[in-house]
Amino acid sequence: MRAVVQRIKEGKVTVEGEITGECNFGLLVYLGVGREDTVEDAKYLAEKIVNLRIFEDQEEKLNLSVKDVGGSLLVISQFTLFGDCRKGRRPSFSEAAKPDEADYLYQEFVRCCNDVGMTVGTGVFQAHMMVHAINDGPVTMLIDSKKTF
């Protein structure tokens, strides 16, 4: 499971002009599910992200998590995080999970975040979404549950 995590001042996602999720302050998480991912990957990544210390403390050091600062999450499914661009010019998505399994693990990730008290806004799985965000910093992290980077 892979995530691109961005610290944001605000964000929202719309599908066909309707807001489906929003975050007034916190983290925008683009989440990709790989074909070998399990519930354990969802749990690991949720715990890692909600406790990741990428918010500044009083000394302007990155010492606080989204939980510490009372922020929320906006989680967007994005299978393209498993796009392999090493050969040719068209990405291969063969390492991405099948839609049914990806949706299940995406929902499991959201549930794990909710279980630790996080407010989570979401997009719509497999929908064409418009994501609007005001990045803060910017601070952007790449996280992989298999620890490949």
Swiss-Prot record:
SUPFAM superfamilies: DTD-like. GO terms for biological process: D-amino acid catabolic process. It is found in: Cytoplasm. It comes from the Bacteria. It is an enzyme of class 3 (hydrolase). A motif (Gly-cisPro motif, important for rejection of L-amino acids) lies at residues 137-138. One of its GO terms (cellular component) is cytoplasm. It catalyses: glycyl-tRNA(Ala) + H2O = tRNA(Ala) + glycine + H(+); a D-aminoacyl-tRNA + H2O = a tRNA + a D-alpha-amino acid + H(+). Keywords: Cytoplasm, Hydrolase, RNA-binding, tRNA-binding. Its EC number is 3.1.1.96. One of its GO terms (molecular function) is Gly-tRNA(Ala) deacylase activity. Homodimer. PANTHER family: D-AMINOACYL-TRNA DEACYLASE 1, D-TYROSYL-TRNA TYR DEACYLASE. Belongs to the DTD family. An aminoacyl-tRNA editing enzyme that deacylates mischarged D-aminoacyl-tRNAs. Also deacylates mischarged glycyl-tRNA(Ala), protecting cells against glycine mischarging by AlaRS. Acts via tRNA-based rather than protein-based catalysis; rejects L-amino acids rather than detecting D-amino acids in the active site. By recycling D-aminoacyl-tRNA to D-amino acids and free tRNA molecules, this enzyme counteracts the toxicity associated with the formation of D-aminoacyl-tRNA entities in vivo and helps enforce protein L-homochirality. HAMAP family: Deacylase_Dtd. A Gly-cisPro motif from one monomer fits into the active site of the other monomer to allow specific chiral rejection of L-amino acids. This is D-aminoacyl-tRNA deacylase. It comes from Alkaliphilus metalliredigens (strain QYMF). The lineage of its organism: Bacteria, Bacillati, Bacillota, Clostridia, Peptostreptococcales.
